[in-house]
Amino acid sequence: MTKISSLLTTQVIKIPLEAEDKDELFTELVQVLINAGTLPAARRAEAEQVLEAREEKMSTGVGGGLALPHGRLANLEAPLLALGIAPNGLEYDALDGLPVNVVLAIFTPESDPEAHVQILTEVSHLFLVPGLVSRLSACHSSVEALELIKREE
């Protein structure tokens, strides 16, 4: 199984998020991937649309302060993740009605549905760790957040 920490670098972790709503959030997380050089800027609109289309089906705010917007992109060689932390919470229309503090955007290759399921499975196992969302919410740097994830995997 792929460890989530192996798909994250400090360059794809944004603390604090600046977005004030879900639309701004998707734009911000896609920009994080572009700034890190893992997603070409020419694919910005496509990546945002993939997240928005998934969100229209059902909120990816899974509850407990966590949101997992995700989707599959054509012509992607490997999975891409971007982690954003909103210490004060962000309105997200989560399933429990509460704001989210931790958002992990996940893009997987359209040609590899197994990778998509595998990563979502690994993420769900990781976030079963009691108190992880609140501890991530308290992180002040991307280094601190990545180290916490590595310790808990």
Roles of regions detected by a PLM:
Residues 1-153:
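Cytosolic covalent-transfer regions centered on His/Cys nucleophiles
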